[in-house]
Amino acid sequence: MAINKEKKKEIVEKVDGVLQNATSVVFVNFHKLPVSETTTMRKTLRGQGVGYTVAKKTLLKRALSDRAFAGILPELAGEIAVVYGTGEDMMLPAREVYAFQKKSGGRITIIGGIFEATYKTKSEMTEIASIPSREILLAQFVNVINSPIQGFVRALDQISKKKSI
């Protein structure tokens, strides 16, 4: 479907606004994803405070050319959507898309992204997506600190039981 010049300009401005406000961006290929699953994913993402927008590759590249990101833009193959987050958790968009990618059997794929003002490859964005959330990391840290203390308390308890006998 042909898009007139005004509509193209509007799309480029929208994507540019997304890029300006986003803390991180994930480029996804959604070619094999049915509309019903796309709708489900959009609702899930929206509930998490993550945005999802679709744009033609040429218009996306035009919006990206206005921004100075380090690195090389990953190859944008297939039908491209931009998943972006504007909140404190910079890894949330990548994590949510990665979870949906595993759930959908690979019908949607991460093809790259922008993290900390640097273009990232597919593998780098997948690594970022596999990092647990801040809450989980804090819980793991507390567990690591707490384990030796628990062992020490058990040892003291056993010693006190032996002495009381």
For each feature predicted by the language model, list its residue ranges.
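Short amphipathic alpha-helical segments with heptad-repeat character
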Residues: 2, 9, 16, 139-146, ...
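A short, charged helix-loop
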Residues: 110-134
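Short hinge/gating elements
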Residues: 29, 81, 123-130, 138-143
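Positively charged, polar, low-complexity stretches
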Residues: 1-114, 128, 161-165
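Charged phosphate-binding loop/patch that engages nucleotide di/tri-phosphates or the phosphate backbone
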Residues: 143-165
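Acidic and generally charged, gly/proline-rich low-complexity regions
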Residues: 94, 98, 127-131, 135, ...
